[in-house]
């Protein structure tokens, strides 16, 4: 089985280069003199509050990319970073502490956007601005100032469309049978992924089983698959919709443990985790959705810097991504910056992109992206598979 922690390890080098703090309770400052001439005390500070550390991207990508960009554009302004480790109570305490310490802007990726009312109330009471980062805050009567994310319903559509195309190409002779694993119900993004995938697949496949990872854990996906394979057998399904790469790792492990060849059961993913891309190269995972987390994190850092200095204008390099209609969070239409996700497969078929043209071209895991993907220490077959796939 491929190492499911490789993505986090791969980007440690990036984190080191950008000088990000490794502690989930660290406070970073952004340099010695404010280019605007304003002191940190005069403009307040910014708090970056991320939801969990089960998914590798938050500590390995969002945090360092945000921190580096913030350092470069907001010199002299204090940045307070916290990770809630999937605890709503912890995140509330972190937000309240940040506000007490002088934060005037919260960049909040909520553990549970539907129950973030107390955080939003605390921010509102002190006139603190809130950027809803990656996950939309949908708590009743909550109106974050901005929402920055990807088009998350589009993510699900990309997953579903790619899976359907692959299943149809297999000439099964029957309507494809699909096992379906959604993301955490606490995460509004997971709801949007699910909606998009159902839009692409409903009426075109038979959904044999459908459930969700309660906390986005690989082990949760593996447990679901263990039960389902026992129930329906290896011939009872043709493919697997999985909301993210962590879940795909669990599906892969379950299939291998039950003697099911993953190459014969195409599955989806999301996040371009290193082990997932290695599975794609080896043919044991069909696709992933590549989201340029660096772009998302840097956009949030730029906007937070502008807001902490009192600007209401969108930084000029972000205007093209502003959604004209905004995104409705159930209370109001929230001003939104929505970025474009990409479907990635080994061959770029059916409207997808190749690993080489996206993840390699962007050096997503650092300057040694190719050597990490094609590491023979992970799987002796990877170098040859990379060569065959044009990953170089």
Language model regions located:
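A residue-level marker of the well-folded mature domains of exported/periplasmic proteins
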Residues: 2-4, 22-392
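Bacterial N-terminal signal peptides that target proteins for export
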Residues: 1-11
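C-terminal motif of bacterial Sec signal peptides marking the signal peptidase cleavage site
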Residues: 15-20
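A periodicity- and composition-biased signal for non-globular, repetitive helical segments
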Residues: 11-12, 97
């Amino acid at each position: 089985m491929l190492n499911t922690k490789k993505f986090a390890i791969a980007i440690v080098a990036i984190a080191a280069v950008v000088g990000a703090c490794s502690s989930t309770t660290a406070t970073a400052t952004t340099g010695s003199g404010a280019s605007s001439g304003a002191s940190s005390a005069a403009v307040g500070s910014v708090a970056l509050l991320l939801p969990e550390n089960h998914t590798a991207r938050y500590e390995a990508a969002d945090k360092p990319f945000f921190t580096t960009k913030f350092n470069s554009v907001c010199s002299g302004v204090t940045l307070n970073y916290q990770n809630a480790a999937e605890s709503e109570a912890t995140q509330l305490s972190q937000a309240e502490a940040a506000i007490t310490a002088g934060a005037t802007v919260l960049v909040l990726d909520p553990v549970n956007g539907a129950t973030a009312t107390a955080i939003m109330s605390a921010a509102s009471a002190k006139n603190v601005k809130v950027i809803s980062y990656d996950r939309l805050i949908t708590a009743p009567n909550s109106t974050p100032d901005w929402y920055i994310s990807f088009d998350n319903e589009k993510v699900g559509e990309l997953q579903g469309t790619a899976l359907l195309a692959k299943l149809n190409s297999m000439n099964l002779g029957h309507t494809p049978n699909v096992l379906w694993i959604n993301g955490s119900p606490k995460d509004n993004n997971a709801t949007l992924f699910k909606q998009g995938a159902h839009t692409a697949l409903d009426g075109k496949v038979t959904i044999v089983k459908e459930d969700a990872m309660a906390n986005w854990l690989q082990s949760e996906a593996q447990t679901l698959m263990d039960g389902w394979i026992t129930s329906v057998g290896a011939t009872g399904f043709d493919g697997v919709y999985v909301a993210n790469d962590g879940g795909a790792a669990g599906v892969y492990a379950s299939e291998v443990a039950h003697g099911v060849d993953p190459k014969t059961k195409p599955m989806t993913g999301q996040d371009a985790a290193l082990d997932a891309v290695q599975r794609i190269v080896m043919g044991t995972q069909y696709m992933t959705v590549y989201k340029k987390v660096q772009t998302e994190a840097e956009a949030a850092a730029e906007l937070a810097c502008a807001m902490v200095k009192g600007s209401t204008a969108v930084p000029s390099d972000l205007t093209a991504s502003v959604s004209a209609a905004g995104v409705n969070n159930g209370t109001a239409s929230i001003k939104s910056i929505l970025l474009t996700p990409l479907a990635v497969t080994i061959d770029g078929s059916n409207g997808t992109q190749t690993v080489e043209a996206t993840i390699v071209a962007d050096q997503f895991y650092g300057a040694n992206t190719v050597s990490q993907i094609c590491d023979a220490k992970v799987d002796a077959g990877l170098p040859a598979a990379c060569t065959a796939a044009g990953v170089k």
